[in-house]
Structure formats: structure tokens, C-alpha cells
Amino acid sequence: TDIRTGLTDEECQEIHEMNMLGMHAYWSIGLIANALAYAWRPFHQGRAGNRLEDHAPDYVRSALT
């Protein structure tokens, strides 16, 4: 038992495993979300640019005009 935390080595390893699992889940969800966002609307600009008016749904375009 560690005097500073009061946890055993096994408890510390269990907490570490849960933290790593949470981090991997967070990174995986972020990677998937960014891939979907890129598939929907690429981050790079083409020759004509990447104007909202060219890609927005009709209800957004009507609100802009």
C-alpha cells in the first residue's frame, strides 16, 4: 500500500487500465468524428474555395439570403 494514496499496486493498475481505456475511446471517437466531418466537407480549399453557400442545405441558404 502506498502511503500517499492508500491504494495497493493492483488498485493502481486497475485505475491505470481504466484511464487508458477511456483515453483510447476518446481518441477513437474523435478520429471517427473527424473522418466523418472530412467526408462531409473536406477541410482543404479547392480552386473555387469552400464557400458555405455551395455546400449548405437549402434551408441554410435561404436564411443567408
Swiss-Prot record:
It is a single-pass type II membrane protein. Keywords: Antenna complex, Bacteriochlorophyll, Cell inner membrane, Cell membrane, Chlorophyll, Chromophore, Light-harvesting polypeptide, Magnesium, Membrane, Metal-binding, Transmembrane, Transmembrane helix. InterPro entries: Antenna_beta_dom_sf, LHB-1/5, Light-harvesting_complex. Disulfide bonds: none annotated. One of its GO terms (molecular function) is metal ion binding. One of its GO terms (biological process) is photosynthesis, light reaction. One of its GO terms (cellular component) is plasma membrane light-harvesting complex. The chain crosses the membrane at residues 18-40. The core complex is formed by different alpha and beta chains, binding bacteriochlorophyll molecules, and arranged most probably in tetrameric structures disposed around the reaction center. The non-pigmented gamma chains may constitute additional components. Belongs to the antenna complex beta subunit family. This is Light-harvesting protein B800/830/1020 beta-2 chain.
